[in-house]
Amino acid sequence: MEIGQQVKVCRLRDRVSPLIIKRLGKVGTVKGFKMLDGSNVGIIVQFEDQFATWFFEDELKVM
């Protein structure tokens, strides 16, 4: 995945807040990356309403 790409949230791996659950099935734009634990990288996604959060790569699908 690259910065600027459109992605769709296709699954949620962990229990998350209702605010994140509302993003399931939504499309957003990759804004950056976040180092998680030394071996995993999170993808920072921003949505139309300017809300941004990170997801695991396997939770997203490139559009």
Short names for language-model regions:
Residues E2-M63:
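Basic/aromatic-rich interaction segments and small domains that mediate binding to polyanionic partners
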